């Protein structure tokens, strides 16, 4: 079944989903092939290491994060990006409160 968001997403019309542990998520635009998600982290919050079958590209909109992917760890800041291959262990720790913009291919049905 085809899934698709509205054409426009406005900050004041989107709800934050509380994921616990100082992490919140907003679902942005999506269809069956792609999804964009905004994730807000408080300082010290952790995106626990995990694996999924999706390609993922993350843009650091604000803050500072320690990211681990495919066995490598780097500090990333606003303006930086991270690519996570499918089926690769990855996770992050928020060093300074911030927002990540995650893009997935295909759509993360488990987020809807």
Predicted regions and their residues:
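Short acidic-glycine-tyrosine-enriched beta hairpin
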Residues: 71-86
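A short, N-terminal "cap"/entry segment at the start of jelly-roll beta-barrel domains
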Residues: 1-33
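Ligand-binding loop in jelly-roll beta-barrel domains
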Residues: 86-110
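A cytosolic small-molecule/anion-sensing beta-strand core signal
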Residues: 61-62, 77-78, 96
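Conserved short histidine dyad/triad with adjacent acidic residue
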Residues: 20, 35-51
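Histidine-centered metal-chelating micro-motifs
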Residues: 46-47, 66, 82, 86-91
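Short, conserved beta-strand element in jelly-roll/cupin
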Residues: 40-41, 51-67
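Structural motif
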Residues: 57, 64-66, 73, 89, ...
